[in-house]
């Protein structure tokens, strides 16, 4: 390192502490980058890569950006997942001895960005910290530096479950300790696409202990400590806006995994990943940025406490019934800026005068808002605004201190009002009168010299001067002025009197700018005292904003207040899919009932492709979510239970599980539901089994239906193309067949989109192909093939039978299918009547079949089958075992 110049040595020393970040190294009016940083930054930012002499034999790669434009370049890098360490000159170059001292003043990362285009006003920007414990549990702490919000929770379960909870926070960066395994880190980076950062310190930093007073579990404190230590280490400044840590537990809210959230398009659409077209898009009528953020948080975690849901619903009902109250509230909310993020900027020290002006305008609306809500006869409303301080003294302070149209910069003056500070008023008097004197001097000199073009000007190099054109130099009295500068067409002069006034004016202006800056920073410190009150106000206003948003959309879309019941029953009259109905934009939407009494758990849905089966299923889920976040629902009447979880298998494979086939994804999501669902859950399965052969798919579909029906008892909508499964209605007393109706007119299919009792007679797949405008020749051939297939023997689904066991359980008799003659190696088995292949048993059910000779491999498999205890296996386990044995038979 000694071969480099002192400045490059300084750079390398600083860079050694920030190996995973771009180092923006301040040199005069530029931030420079060197070596590998320069090469990479030039590529990412599309700026010129150059080089400089650094004292070594080879020139050093270099690139740079102007300091006044650095913010834009930093945002570009952070948006791409990089970190940027900002290294400033921390001493005056004029007084420095040797190399100017430089220090990193801030490390900017995806999870610690405070402002810029990467920060959506209606999105939180969470930084996550994950701590792994020896017992297999994890603690997850999150911080939004822009608002000061802090949360923590304890997580148990599989690594995949943990990752999905991390993903649900929307964090762009996650902090872990250096002992995290490579496998765990790979899942974080590859699966969740997050920036990884490291922090080993877990003790709560000094001065922040008050933020964890309500946290007693050591595991949670460790996670919060890791988070706080990282934030302090990277930001290197006051964090007075950090709020007390909120503990939440996942079992306090309805669980909806990421797959289901995506399938249901709660906050973004499945295809475009955009808000437009999602349920959030429909429900978001909030007027404030902080209200928008709270709405999304509510949608991420619907409630499961009946009383809390009903409180919200009652407030929404109040706003729905009182149009004038709602409209007046909306008008006031329009004038309220983002109090949470304004408070964060105050604490962070990057608030400007315009921000404080916005704060004042916001606070002016608060007294009227609080008064209007206080007049409501509603316990929830009274509790909500309890302790809310309108901060009227702060409003008054800002009103007499900040100019109405201040500049963006706090270093250019013209921020503070006249009358706020006596000394500032004195300086302004001198400056103002001095300039008046300059104007009077110019007029006087014109009169004395008779030169009408004579003027007095100013520049930073020469100060004030008298300018006379060369054509008028002869008219000047001898010795009146002292020559200062010669121009091509004029001469500039000064006088002793002019220089004296200049000194007074410039000193006053310089002192004005400095004093205004000092007064503003002092004012900022006074505002800091109000941060806790502002944050409390922000929560109150955010909640009111979300509730009025629910009321507004409920009124506009003619939603109805749901009735919550402790019974396991669903009664939805004329239910609609809220987003589809909105997108239809006035076109007739066909509503559908969903009536499932306590003794009805499963709807087996059949019907044509494109008829609306998936829409009907999503509709029920969205109605449920809307109900449990406290919103009215799209129906004419709705009685609903409180669901603890929603599981879905709808639509295309989710890209979170990469490298898996559609069928494997189906099975994984089915497993998730079967393993975790309770009788208080809602399960939506669309076309389970489509990713494998017909027989395998049908067998699995039946096994899953029976397991849900017999073992779980969850309310379930199960759509299928396996029409043979509709006979299950005869053997499963809590299953009901329903179908989406369609009719044929003049050879064309007409989808009625209406749910009716009973099973569908056909799927109309070829008609859908015609709608897709497949070639006529292809359609004709498909009809020929269909006619041939329909002439063959059909698949038979037998009734369930009782099997005597120690506890007389009822288990399903094997699914059986009509088949052509079965060939096992060289031995043929001919069907005289029926030949049935058992999926759960070992014997052929047709007694008239000839018994084939078995080879050694088949005998071994048969022996294994005889040893299987079906009563001790789930249907899925039985299918897996059958699949293994089948593969064994096929080998060789």
Curated annotation (Swiss-Prot):
State the source organism's domain of life: Bacteria
The UniProt GO MF terms for this protein read: ATP binding; ATP-dependent DNA damage sensor activity; damaged DNA binding; mismatched DNA binding
Q: Name one GO cellular component term.
A: cytosol
Which BP terms from GO are recorded?
Answer: mismatch repair
Please name the Pfam families in this protein's record: MutS_I, MutS_II, MutS_III, MutS_IV, MutS_V
InterPro entries linked to this entry: DNA_mismatch_repair_MutS, DNA_mismatch_repair_MutS-lik_N, DNA_mismatch_repair_MutS/MSH, DNA_mismatch_repair_MutS_C, DNA_mismatch_repair_MutS_clamp, DNA_mismatch_repair_MutS_core, DNA_mismatch_repair_MutS_N, DNA_mismatch_repair_MutS_sf
Membrane-crossing ranges are none
What this protein is called in its record is DNA mismatch repair protein MutS
């Amino acid at each position: 390192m000694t071969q480099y110049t002192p400045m490059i040595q300084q750079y390398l020393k600083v860079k050694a502490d920030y190996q995973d970040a771009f180092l923006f190294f301040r040199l005069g009016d530029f931030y420079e980058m060197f070596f590998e940083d320069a090469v990479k930054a030039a590529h990412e930012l599309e700026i010129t890569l150059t080089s400089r002499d650094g004292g070594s034999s080879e020139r050093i790669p270099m690139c740079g950006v102007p300091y006044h434009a650095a913010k834009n370049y930093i945002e570009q890098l952070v948006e791409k997942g990089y970190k940027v360490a900002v290294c400033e000159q921390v001493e005056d170059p004029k007084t420095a001895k040797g190399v100017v001292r430089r220090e990193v003043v801030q490390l900017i990362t995806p999870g610690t960005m405070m402002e810029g285009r990467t920060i959506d006003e209606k999105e939180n920007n969470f930084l996550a910290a994950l701590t792994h414990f020896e017992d297999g549990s994890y603690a997850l702490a999150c911080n939004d530096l822009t608002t000061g919000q802090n949360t923590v929770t304890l997580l148990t379960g599989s690594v995949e479950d943990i990752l999905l909870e991390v993903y649900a926070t929307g964090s762009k960066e996650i902090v872990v300790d250096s002992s995290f395994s490579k496998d765990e880190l790979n899942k974080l980076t590859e699966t969740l696409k997050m920036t990884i950062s490291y922090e080993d310190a877990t003790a709560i930093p000094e001065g922040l202990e008050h933020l964890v007073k309500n946290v007693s579990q050591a595991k949670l404190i460790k996670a919060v400590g890791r988070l706080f230590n990282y934030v302090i280490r990277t930001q290197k400044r006051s964090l007075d806006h950090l709020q007390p840590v909120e503990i939440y537990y996942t079992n306090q809210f309805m669980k909806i995994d990421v797959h289901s959230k995506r399938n249901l398009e709660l906050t973004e659409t499945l295809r475009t990943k955009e808000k437009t077209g999602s349920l959030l898009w429909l429900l978001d009528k909030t007027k404030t940025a902080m209200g928008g953020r709270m709405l999304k948080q509510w949608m991420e975690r619907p409630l499961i406490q009946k009383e809390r849901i009903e409180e919200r619903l009652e407030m929404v009902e109040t706003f729905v019934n009182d149009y004038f109250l709602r409209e007046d509230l909306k008008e006031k909310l329009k004038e309220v800026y983002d109090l949470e993020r304004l408070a964060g900027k105050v604490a962070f020290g990057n608030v400007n005068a315009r921000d404080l002006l916005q704060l004042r305008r916001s606070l002016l609306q608060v007294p009227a808002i609080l008064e209007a809500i206080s007049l409501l006869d509603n316990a929830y409303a009274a509790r909500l605004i309890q302790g809310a301080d309108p901060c009227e003294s702060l409003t008054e302070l800002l009103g007499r201190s900040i100019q109405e149209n201040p500049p963006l910069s706090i270093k250019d003056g013209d921020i503070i009002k006249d009358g706020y500070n006596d000394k500032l008023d004195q300086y302004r008097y001198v400056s103002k009168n001095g300039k008046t004197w300059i104007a009077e001097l110019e007029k006087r000199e014109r009169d004395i010299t008779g030169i009408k073009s004579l003027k007095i000007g100013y520049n930073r190099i020469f100060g004030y001067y008298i300018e006379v054109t060369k054509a008028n130099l002869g008219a000047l009295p001898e010795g009146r002025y002292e020559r200062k500068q010669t121009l091509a067409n004029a001469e500039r002069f000064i006088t002793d009197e002019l220089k004296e006034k200049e000194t007074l004016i410039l000193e006053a202006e310089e002192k004005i700018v400095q004093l205004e800056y000092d007064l503003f920073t002092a004012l900022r410190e006074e505002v800091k005292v109000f941060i806790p009150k502002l944050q409390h106000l922000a929560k109150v206003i955010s909640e009111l904003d979300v509730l009025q948003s629910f009321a507004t959309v409920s009124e506009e879309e003619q939603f109805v207040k749901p009735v919550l019941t402790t019974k396991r029953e669903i009664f939805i009259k004329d239910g609609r899919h809220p987003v589809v109905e909105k997108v239809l934009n006035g076109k007739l939407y066909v509503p559908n009932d969903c009536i499932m009494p306590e003794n009805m758990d499963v709807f087996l849905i059949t019907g044509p492709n494109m008829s609306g089966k998936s829409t009907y299923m999503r509709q029920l889920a969205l109605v449920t979510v809307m109900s449990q976040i406290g919103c009215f629902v799209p129906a004419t009447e709705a009685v609903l239970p409180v669901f603890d979880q929603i599981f879905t298998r709808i639509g295309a494979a989710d890209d979170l599980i990469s490298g898996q086939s559609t069928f494997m994804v189906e099975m994984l999501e089915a497993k998730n539901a079967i393993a975790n669902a309770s009788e208080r859950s809602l399960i939506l399965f669309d076309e389970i089994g489509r990713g494998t052969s017909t027989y395998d798919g049908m067998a699995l579909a039946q096994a899953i239906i029976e397991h849900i029906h017999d073992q779980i008892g969850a309310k379930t909508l199960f759509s299928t193309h396996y029409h043979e499964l509709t006979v299950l209605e005869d053997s499963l007393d809590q299953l009901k067949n329903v179908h989406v109706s369609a009719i044929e007119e003049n050879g064309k299919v007409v989808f009625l989109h209406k749910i009716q009792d009973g099973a569908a007679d056909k799927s109309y797949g070829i008609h859908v192909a015609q709608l897709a405008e497949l070639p006529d020749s292809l359609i004709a051939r498909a009809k020929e093939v269909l006619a041939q297939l329909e002439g063959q023997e059909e698949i038979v689904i037998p009734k369930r039978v009782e099997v005597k066991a120690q506890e007389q359980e009822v288990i399903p008799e094997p699914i059986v299918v009509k088949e052509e003659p079965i060939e096992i190696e060289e031995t043929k088995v001919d069907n005289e009547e029926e030949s049935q292949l058992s999926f759960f048993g070992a014997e052929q059910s047709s007694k008239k079949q000839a018994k084939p000779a078995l080879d050694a491999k088949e005998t071994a498999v048969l022996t294994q089958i005889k040893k299987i205890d079906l009563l001790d296996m789930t249907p899925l386990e039985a299918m897996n075992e059958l699949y293994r044995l089948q593969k064994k038979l096929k080998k060789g």
